[in-house]
C-alpha cells in the first residue's frame, strides 16, 4: 500500500496544484471520489487488464461512466454516494445534474491511462484529500492505541502533533489490544509506531540481522 501511495504522490500533487490554482478543488475531488469507486469495480479491473483495449479507450470509458452517473437528472448509485458525503446536500440535489468532467480532468485521466496508472486513482484521491487538508491547515491523524486514550493523553498527542505539523489536527481514534501498549500514529502514508509490539518487531529484526 505504501508503494502505491508513493507512485500516486506526483499525480495527486499535479492534480491538486492545478485545482488549487484554478479554484476547482471541489470538481476534481468529486471526480476522483467517483472514479475511485469505478476503478475498484471488478468488471472495470478486468477491462483495465485487457491488453486488447487501448489506453485511450480505457480513459474514455472511465470519463463516460462518470459523466453518465453525474449528469443524469435521475438519481444514480454513484451520484447518491457522492452526495451522501457532502454535508450540505439535501434530498432535491439527487435529482439534479452535476457538471460533467472538464477537459482538464479528461486530459489528466488520459495521462494516467497512457502511463498505465488508472488503477492508482484511489491512492491519488487519498493523496489529493491530504493536500486539500494541508492547504486548509487541517490534518487528519489516525491514532491506534492498545487501550482507549484518556482525555489527557488525547490532548497531549494533539498538541504535540499540531506543534510539529504547524496545522490543526483532527484525531481519529481506534483501539487494538494486540499493540500491547503504546500507540501508532498514521498521517497520510506516514506511520509512526511507538507501540510495544512495534518495538518488539524492531528488536527481533536487529537480533536476526
Curated annotation (Swiss-Prot):
A Gene Ontology cellular component where this protein is annotated is: proton-transporting ATP synthase complex
State its location(s). Answer: Cell inner membrane
Keywords annotated in UniProt: ATP synthesis, Cell inner membrane, Cell membrane, CF(1), Hydrogen ion transport, Ion transport, Membrane, Transport
Topology relative to the lipid bilayer, per the entry, is: Peripheral membrane protein
Family affiliation: Belongs to the ATPase delta chain family.
Q: Which PROSITE patterns match?
A: ATPASE_DELTA
Q: What is the protein name stated in its UniProt record?
A: ATP synthase subunit delta
Family annotation (InterPro entries): ATP_synth_OSCP/delta_N_sf, ATPase_OSCP/d_CS, ATPase_OSCP/dsu
Q: Which domain of life is it from?
A: Bacteria
Under the subunit heading, UniProt states: F-type ATPases have 2 components, F(1) - the catalytic core - and F(0) - the membrane proton channel. F(1) has five subunits: alpha(3), beta(3), gamma(1), delta(1), epsilon(1). F(0) has three main subunits: a(1), b(2) and c(10-14). The alpha and beta chains form an alternating ring which encloses part of the gamma chain. F(1) is attached to F(0) by a central stalk formed by the gamma and epsilon chains, while a peripheral stalk is formed by the delta and b chains.
Cross-referenced SUPFAM superfamilies, in alphabetical order?
N-terminal domain of the delta subunit of the F1F0-ATP synthase (SSF47928)
**Molecular function as annotated in GO:** proton-transporting ATP synthase activity, rotational mechanism
What is any Pfam family matched here?
A: OSCP
Q: What Gene3D superfamilies does the database record attribute to this sequence?
A: N-terminal domain of the delta subunit of the F1F0-ATP synthase
What is the purpose of this protein?
F(1)F(0) ATP synthase produces ATP from ADP in the presence of a proton or sodium gradient. F-type ATPases consist of two structural domains, F(1) containing the extramembraneous catalytic core and F(0) containing the membrane proton channel, linked together by a central stalk and a peripheral stalk. During catalysis, ATP synthesis in the catalytic domain of F(1) is coupled via a rotary mechanism of the central stalk subunits to proton translocation.
